[in-house]
Amino acid sequence: MKLIEPIYIIKQETRKKQYLELLLLGDEQESMIDRYLECGEMYVMLLTESGSPIGVAVVTDEGDDVCELKNIAISPSFQRHGYGKRFIAYLCQQYKGIKQIMQVGTGDSVQTTSFYRSCGFLYSHTIPNFFVDHYDHPILEEGKFCLLYTSPSPRD
């Protein structure tokens, strides 16, 4: 499959839980999603203006000129075709001038950290045992339990 043009990204103000199936791809515990879904701004990616969603993202205001990409998920059949990268580029552009920093809290598997590095994010810090302390079941990525934060690389 090749990247299909154009894509549409809409801000979803209501009925955010209708996208739970996609949200669970990015965060597998519904109670955690519930903690940020209503207070966050949700975006939905579509291939056509009235088409089915292929991706979702939720961004929260963390205060002090920081926002956080809490969840981003692309439907499995559309993964590894550039949609996630384009979604993140769109979100960074949306918040440019509103927030100084967009951070991402994520598992620290090689695949995940490589993806965020390719989007311009750099390692910021780690919260040891985040998944152990906040999830009702073990969440492992390549045998690791910790959560790390990334921020965009400095721009000239």
Where are these regions (language model features)?
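Conserved GNAT acetyl-CoA-binding A-motif
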Residues: 95-107
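Conserved catalytic-core motifs of GNAT/GCN5-like acyltransferases
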Residues: 103-105, 122-145
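Conserved N-terminal entry element of GNAT/NAT acetyltransferase domains
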Residues: 1-14
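Active-site rim helix/loop that mediates acceptor-substrate recognition in acyltransferases
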Residues: 17-48
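Conserved acetyl-CoA pyrophosphate-binding loop and the N-cap/start of the following alpha-helix
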Residues: 78, 82-90
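A short, internal acetyl-CoA/4′-phosphopantetheine-binding micro-motif in the GNAT/acyltransferase core
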Residues: 72-79, 107
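Conserved small/polar residues in nucleotide/adenosyl-binding loops
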Residues: 149-156
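Conserved beta-strand in the GNAT
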Residues: 44, 52-61, 66-73
